[in-house]
């Protein structure tokens, strides 16, 4: 039997890829990779681009950002330079994504020269420095105001209470501090060094930005960026279009690329086939981003790194480092990819052939033209005949030809003004080559004596030639012997960076600090992510069984909160094991944070008012505004109903709401009290303006050393009753978080809200800090969770108190920052002793299971609520709900207390009450927001929701807890429409 052998490895290598299994495996792998890319793209941020883009432009933006963002090209509207505008939006988002951000907040970022309305509408934590340098900037601000108004009118609830964060100062003058910054096409007027100085003024260490870029700017006087359809051109002044005609070779030979002319050279950017506004900038500023590498200023060294250059846009980053920088050679290069197919040709720039200039010509065109010129050259022919031959070949290589009815571009078109001079230069170059070759041949073929004489006489000939060129410059045309110039495809820059910044930068300590800070923020972020995941994965809770009826027993309110007698007020408090030094450090840190917070609130108020004043045409010299103030203030009035203008005649632009009194105003003199004869502007922050005083006073106080005790009790556990029983006028003072709580405690204690005794012993924390007050040994604090820990410490320090006994519910609404950009870390109370009270005497019996059910749905898994024990109230069923079609169907009963989650719903109820001619006391005292009603107790309460648009407050356990625990007898929830995630509406039917 015959046998045969074969090499299995060779067969697999040659035929393996043709097998069905191999093809199927490749298809499966390709499908998985495509699916992963698609899923990644779907998870990316959705970016909607309304500009109409053609196919080529769409590919440009998808290639650059399609892998990072889920791009939706809506093709809705034609816009000037549409691709540039679309790229600008993606560049802004890309630069912001470079910096740290969490699900809770984004670290504050500065935007030098950016569009503040873009950040405002998207909710970015960004402060824009948008100076009004001219009419163009003011036009842009006016358009942004209109855009903001347009969006807010369509969805006012989303922007309720939100203010745009920007100023009209230059980047170097603004005082807002942030570690990070962006500059989207904002560095043209500042230059590299200007950006570095602005970063230094803001304490910024990293900046990421973009700008239009074309390497040919270093060589040419004009050029074209094809992707952006942008033509750039250097001009010598803002009012002259004369081009910069300096020899390009001289520019390349200069290592520093000095100015083209002694005067200022500008560069203009024009968009082709678009009769829109162009941009003109100082060429030196733009050039600095290409030539400069480092800059040392005010103890910091800044270095620029060019990251990505695509579609005519360069993305760069500038990083600032402190301390000493030892000597180091920094090298970078700028590439000219468009130069590789070109050669420089010197052509006459004047009729006397004294001035010459260099033009670019396609290498293939010059090579073929010169080849034919060399072959056809004949010194016996008339020069005109040779010139015509060269022009004919040059024309055929740089014109449009028609073949079989189809037009084709041969080579590249030559400038009409240079066409004849290029041909003439090629003729001179050809003739010069033949003459040089002839001299070389004659020298090679000459006798020995002639060669010796030529070599000996050469120094004399060179000397006399130099003298003639100096004395008679017009006799130089024959000396132009180098017609061809080799164009480099790149240019390099070498710079030695060395800076003595004093003390060395301790990178290790900085790394430890950043790591600790990031762990704290990451922990909070992880908790929020876990909470959101629990909401998505929560299994529907089974219906709560009815609670067995509790036999009513009389309860002595004096024993509430576990306080049997006055002497045993803190028997159940557990002492904490923290050292006194650690306690003082914590309190001092909290006080510093609170003072910084109040200062930022004051600075923000001044900045907002200054921005409005400048937008309306005011300045810091004259007490006057321009004629467009109505448009400006109508736009701001749609966001803040307390924005207004006071005229010198005493008239207001808008009627002042009843009960509102402005304590300060703003004009060219700044923020402060104003006279009736002055022109000034106001907003909601001018009603009570005490942030600067609180900052100054808190900063001057030392951290207290006394003991802080906390009674953490549920709603209705008798906290106010306990305060009444413990209060001793000789040693105590009662402190509340707000004026409404102070009035409630005064009435409960003294049966009066304005008597001398009531106002002396029950005061708000702000009142104690801002006014004179006697020293006491003990402070009783009501609703302490509404106070910043630093403010509580400041109150104790000013009163010289040795003990603070604080009452509150840690699960209810806590102190929250009014400035989203402020990094709040130490606002939560850190007590030395704690005690819990989990029995409610106010809430009916069905409230506790309702609260437990809401906690199950809203709080992270494993988190328990204090509302675990039953209620001591005799009322068993109190909670109901019903749907209403509109505010007109909400029953306004003077015997009921009405609460809302938002100020907008509160305003609607007040308007409805006025339409029904209800007493003023009703809509003034008995219609409040949930936040305002914390600490209030009423018999009958109605919660009203008039909109079904997204509102996160209905998902927050703390707000819903306050809402359902204000009543003693009945609670009714009236709502318009279905709201997804409405915690109260979802839980009431299950109780």
Curated annotation (Swiss-Prot):
Positions of disulphide bridges: none
Protein name: Replication protein 1a
Entry keyword ATP-binding: yes
Gene Ontology molecular function, alphabetical: ATP binding; helicase activity; hydrolase activity, acting on acid anhydrides; mRNA methyltransferase activity; RNA binding
Positions of region (ATP-dependent helicase): 711-973
Location of this chain's protein in the cell: Host endoplasmic reticulum membrane
Lineage of origin: Viruses, Riboviria, Orthornavirae, Kitrinoviricota, Alsuviricetes
Keywords: ATP-binding, Helicase, Host endoplasmic reticulum, Host membrane, Hydrolase, Membrane, Methyltransferase, Nucleotide-binding, Transferase
EC numbers for this chain: 3.6.4.-, 2.1.1.-
Main location per the UniProt record: host cell
One GO CC annotation: host cell endoplasmic reticulum membrane
Function: Involved in the virus replication. Contains a helicase domain and a methyltransferase domain. The methyltransferase domain is probably involved in viral RNA capping. Involved in the formation of ER membrane spherular invaginations in which RNA replication complexes form.
Family: Belongs to the bromoviridae replication protein 1a family.
């Amino acid at each position: 039997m015959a046998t045969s052998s074969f090499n299995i490895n060779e067969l697999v290598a040659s035929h393996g890829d043709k097998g069905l299994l191999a093809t199927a495996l490749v298809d499966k792998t390709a499908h998985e990779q495509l699916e992963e890319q698609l899923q990644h793209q779907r998870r990316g941020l959705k970016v909607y681009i309304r500009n109409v883009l053609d196919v080529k432009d769409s590919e440009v933006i998808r290639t650059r950002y399609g892998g990072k963002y889920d791009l939706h090209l809506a093709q809705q509207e034609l816009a000037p330079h549409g691709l540039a505008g679309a790229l600008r939006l993606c560049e802004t988002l890309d630069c912001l994504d470079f910096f740290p951000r969490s699900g809770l907040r984004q670290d504050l970022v500065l935007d030098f020269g950016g569009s503040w309305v873009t950040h405002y509408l998207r909710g970015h934590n960004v402060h824009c420095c948008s100076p009004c340098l001219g009419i163009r900037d003011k036009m842009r601000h006016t358009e942004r105001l209109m855009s903001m108004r347009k969006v807010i009118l369509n969805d006012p609830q989303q922007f309720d209470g939100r203010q745009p964060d920007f100023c009209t100062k230059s980047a170097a003058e603004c005082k807002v501090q942030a570690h990070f910054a962006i500059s989207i096409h904002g560095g043209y007027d500042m230059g590299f060094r200007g950006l570095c100085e602005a970063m230094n003024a803001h304490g910024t260490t990293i900046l990421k930005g973009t700008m239009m870029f074309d390497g040919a700017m270093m060589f040419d006087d004009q050029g074209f960026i094809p992707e952006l359809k942008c033509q750039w051109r250097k001009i010598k002044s803002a009012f002259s279009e004369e081009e910069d005609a300096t020899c390009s070779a001289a520019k390349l030979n200069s290592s520093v690329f000095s100015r083209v002319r002694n005067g200022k050279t500008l560069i203009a950017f024009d968009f082709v086939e678009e009769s829109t506004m162009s941009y003109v900038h100082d060429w030196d500023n733009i050039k600095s981003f290409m030539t400069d590498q480092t800059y040392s200023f005010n103890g910091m060294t800044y270095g620029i790194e060019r990251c990505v250059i695509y579609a005519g846009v360069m993305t760069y980053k500038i990083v600032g480092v402190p301390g000493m920088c030892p000597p180091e050679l920094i090298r970078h290069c700028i590439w000219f990819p468009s130069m590789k197919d070109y050669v420089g040709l010197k052509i006459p720039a004047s009729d006397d052939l004294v001035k010459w200039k260099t033009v670019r010509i396609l290498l293939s065109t010059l090579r073929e033209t010169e080849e034919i010129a060399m072959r056809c050259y004949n010194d016996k022919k008339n020069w005109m005949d040779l010139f015509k031959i060269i022009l004919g070949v040059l024309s055929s290589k740089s014109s449009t030809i028609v073949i079989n009815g189809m037009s084709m571009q041969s080579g590249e078109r030559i400038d009409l003004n240079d066409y004849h001079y290029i041909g003439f230069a090629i003729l001179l170059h050809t003739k010069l080559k033949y003459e040089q070759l002839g001299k070389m041949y004659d020298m090679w073929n000459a006798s020995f004596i002639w060669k010796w004489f030529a070599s000996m006489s050469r120094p004399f000939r060179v000397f006399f030639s130099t003298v003639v060129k100096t004395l008679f410059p017009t006799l130089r045309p024959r000396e132009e012997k180098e017609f061809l110039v080799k164009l480099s495809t790149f240019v390099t820059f070498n710079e030695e960076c060395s800076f003595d910044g004093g003390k060395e930068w301790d990178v290790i300590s900085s790394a430890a600090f950043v790591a600790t800070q990031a762990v704290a923020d990451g922990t909070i972020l992880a908790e929020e992510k876990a909470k959101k995941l629990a909401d998505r994965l929560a299994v529907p809770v089974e219906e709560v069984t009815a609670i067995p009826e509790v036999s009513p027993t009389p309860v002595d309110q004096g024993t509430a909160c576990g306080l049997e007698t006055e002497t045993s007020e803190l028997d159940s408090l557990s002492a904490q094991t923290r050292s006194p030094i650690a306690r003082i450090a914590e309190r001092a840190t909290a006080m510093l944070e609170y003072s910084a917070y109040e200062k930022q609130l004051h600075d923000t108020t001044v900045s907002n008012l200054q921005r409005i004043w400048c937008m309306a045409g005011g300045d810091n010299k004259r007490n006057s505004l321009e004629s467009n103030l109505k448009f400006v203030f109508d736009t701001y009035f749609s966001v803040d109903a307390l924005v207004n203008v006071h005229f010198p005649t005493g008239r207001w632009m808008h009627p002042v709401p009843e009960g509102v009194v402005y304590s300060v105003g703003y004009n060219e003199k700044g923020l402060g009290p104003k006279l009736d004869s002055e022109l000034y502007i106001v907003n909601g922050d001018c009603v009570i303006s005490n942030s600067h005083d609180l900052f100054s006073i808190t900063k001057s106080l030392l951290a207290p050393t006394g003991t802080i005790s906390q009674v953490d009790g549920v709603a209705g556990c008798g906290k106010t009753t306990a305060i009444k029983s413990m209060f001793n006028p000789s040693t105590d003072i009662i402190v509340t978080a707000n004026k409404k709580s102070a009035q409630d405690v005064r009435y409960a204690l003294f049966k009066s809200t304005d008597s001398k005794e009531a106002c002396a012993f029950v005061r708000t924390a702000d009142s104690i800090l801002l006014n004179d007050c006697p020293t006491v040994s003990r402070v009783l604090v009501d609703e302490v969770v509404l106070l910043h820990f630093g403010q509580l410490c400041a109150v104790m320090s000013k009163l010289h108190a040795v003990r603070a006994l604080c009452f509150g519910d840690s699960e209810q609404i806590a102190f929250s920052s009014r400035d989203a950009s402020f990094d709040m870390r130490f606002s939560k109370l850190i007590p030395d002793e704690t005690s819990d009270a989990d029995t409610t005497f106010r809430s009916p019996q069905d409230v506790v299971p309702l609260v437990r059910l809401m906690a199950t749905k809203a709080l992270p898994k494993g988190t328990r609520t204090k509302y675990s024990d039953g209620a001591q109230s005799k009322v068993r069923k109190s909670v109901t709900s019903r749907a209403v079609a509109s505010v007109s169907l909400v029953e306004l009963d003077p015997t009921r207390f009405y609460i809302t989650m938002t100020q907008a719903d509160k305003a609607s109820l007040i308007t409805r009450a006025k339409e029904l001619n209800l007493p003023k006391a009703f809509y003034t005292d008995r219609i409040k927001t949930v936040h305002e009603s914390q600490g209030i107790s009423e018999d009958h309460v109605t919660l009203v929701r008039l909109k079904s648009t997204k509102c996160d407050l209905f998902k927050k356990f703390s707000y819903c807890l306050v809402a359902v625990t204000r009543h003693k007898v009945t609670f009714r929830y009236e709502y318009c429409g279905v709201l997804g995630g409405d915690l109260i509406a979802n839980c009431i039917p299950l109780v």
